[in-house]
Amino acid sequence: MRKRERENPCSICGHYHKYEEGEVCGVCGHCMPVSSDTVAPQQVHVSAFPSEILPEFLYLGSYDNASRSELLKTQGISRVLNTVPMCQNLYRNSFTYHGLDNEKVLQFDDAIKFLDQCEKDKARVLVHCMSGKSRSPAVVVAYLMKRKGWRLAESHQWVKQRRPSTDISPEFYQQLQEFEQGIFGSEMMSAMNINDAPTFGFGFPKIDNQAQAPVFNNAPTSSIFSSPASSIPPQEFTFGATPPKPTTGGDIAMDGS
């Protein structure tokens, strides 16, 4: 194969073969499918190139993308953020690597610190995991929230549009929610509607219909402490069922008014 033909590798597998002519790749066996009505129109091939998230700076991909040094150099990528602790860094002499060493918890702050340095040095960086679907997209989403000031939903949508295969696991998505709370916590609380704030009812249900509450002393009678009618003499008031005892000189008359 002439050198001129080798200047443009296959856009799917990244190797050099006459893919447009239907030649099978001698490295990975890839070949262009034959056009027919039986081929599903929505069928797409995963590109050998990583996805560009931020122009000329941030790229997202899989271990397969990270293993193709020639393609990385074609895109101008010089640094690699490896988010899988057990994943080997293949080209230490050609790229600057940084790895995350926690298998279960994504170290967002550590990753963002490395990406900040890459941006400062104007270096293009690839963030990758094994499949490029969950772990590395979660790290990129965290970076967008931290540095772009975007919320989780907006950052996730941005990444999903540029890498449709993104499928962040529930565990990592929960970590992103906690990371979002740490960034926008005070703003998220202030944005809450005051009507949504809980009321202190001490566990008792709130009575929405006040008409259902019982009403006492609704009769238009006067209070028992109001002045008695003038026709009733004061001495007629008694506090017991027995007749009043006659008063003596030593007794003090009780005022019943």
Curated annotation (Swiss-Prot):
The active site is at C129 (phosphocysteine intermediate). It is found in: Nucleus. It catalyses: O-phospho-L-tyrosyl-[protein] + H2O = L-tyrosyl-[protein] + phosphate. GO terms for biological process: abscisic acid-activated signaling pathway; auxin-activated signaling pathway; intracellular signal transduction; negative regulation of MAP kinase activity; regulation of organ growth; regulation of rate of cell growth; response to abscisic acid; response to auxin. Keywords: Abscisic acid signaling pathway, Auxin signaling pathway, Hydrolase, Nucleus, Protein phosphatase. Its EC number is 3.1.3.48. Expressed in root tips and vasculature, cotyledons, stems, leaves vasculature and hydathodes, flowers, siliques, and seeds. Belongs to the protein-tyrosine phosphatase family. This is Protein-tyrosine-phosphatase IBR5. It comes from Arabidopsis thaliana.
